[in-house]
Amino acid sequence: MNPIVINRLQRKLGYTFHHQELLQQALTHRSASSKHNERLEFLGDSILSFVIANALYHRFPRVDEGDMSRMRATLVRGNTLAEIAREFELGECLRLGPGELKSGGFRRESILADTVEALIGGVFLDSDIQNVERLILSWYQTRLDEISPGDKQKDPKTRLQEYLQGRHLPLPSYLVVQVRGEAHDQEFTIHCQVSGLSEPVVGTGSSRRKAEQAAAEQALKKLELE
């Protein structure tokens, strides 16, 4: 992998790996090698959830568990992680197999999100919980400053349903129109038909549920509720 690209990535991350093999593994998709990033992703997912939960607990001392859970879900969901990945220009650093390269895997939201979690796991193993917590909070500083409790933090499907019910309109319908990839690494494409929109909106995700949420979010944007 190009050392110039790797050094630039580490500057953007705000962390230089002592063990570069952990960074290489974090950037390696299972399509490229048997030594891939899924175990690091598993670890990073749990660490991220803890760090964000801890930050919200101390920032919002009077907010109940339900609102904190919704805020955490907003901050750790796939599209938020993919946004962070794009800020780091992570796509050009990924190690992907030929099939994923050809199909544009370096742009795929689920792969970008998973890689951010793998990087978190890698930083933890390369250093300690204090370092990785500091790093995550630096990545999330603006988002933590901007987030607030309330209905805005309900998931998109719930908000879309409540909007339509409040206007006595039919509930949205979700249809799977495409499933790509192998069983362990699928991408679902969903069409969501919403009363008031002339065409179905499209959402993609690594599971049917995530794709439906993505479609609902697009519908909310078209309805100018997002």
UniProtKB/Swiss-Prot annotation:
Cofactor names: Mg(2+)
Reactions that this protein is recorded to catalyse: Endonucleolytic cleavage to 5'-phosphomonoester
Location of the DRBM domain: 155-225
The enzyme's E.C. designation: 3.1.26.3
Short name of one Pfam family: Ribonucleas_3_3
InterPro entries assigned: dsRBD_dom, RNase_III, RNase_III_dom, RNase_III_sf
Record-level Gene Ontology MF annotations: double-stranded RNA binding; metal ion binding; ribonuclease III activity; rRNA binding
GO cellular component labels: cytoplasm
Domain RNase III: 6-128
Binding locations of Mg(2+): E41, D114, E117
UniProt keyword Hydrolase present: yes
Keywords for this protein: Cytoplasm, Endonuclease, Hydrolase, Magnesium, Metal-binding, mRNA processing, Nuclease, RNA-binding, rRNA processing, rRNA-binding, tRNA processing
CDD domains registered for this protein in UniProt: DSRM_RNAse_III_family, RIBOc
Gene3D superfamilies listed in its UniProt record: 3.30.160.20, Ribonuclease III domain
Subcellular location: Cytoplasm
This protein's record includes keyword tRNA processing: yes
Superkingdom, natural source: Bacteria
GO biological process, alphabetically ordered: mRNA processing; regulation of gene expression; rRNA processing; tRNA processing
Catalytic site positions: D45, E117
HAMAP family, per database record: RNase_III
Subunit structure: Homodimer.
Entry function: Digests double-stranded RNA. Involved in the processing of primary rRNA transcript to yield the immediate precursors to the large and small rRNAs (23S and 16S). Processes some mRNAs, and tRNAs when they are encoded in the rRNA operon. Processes pre-crRNA and tracrRNA of type II CRISPR loci if present in the organism.
Family per record: Belongs to the ribonuclease III family.
Name under which the protein is recorded: Ribonuclease 3
Organism per entry: Klebsiella pneumoniae subsp. pneumoniae (strain ATCC 700721 / MGH 78578)
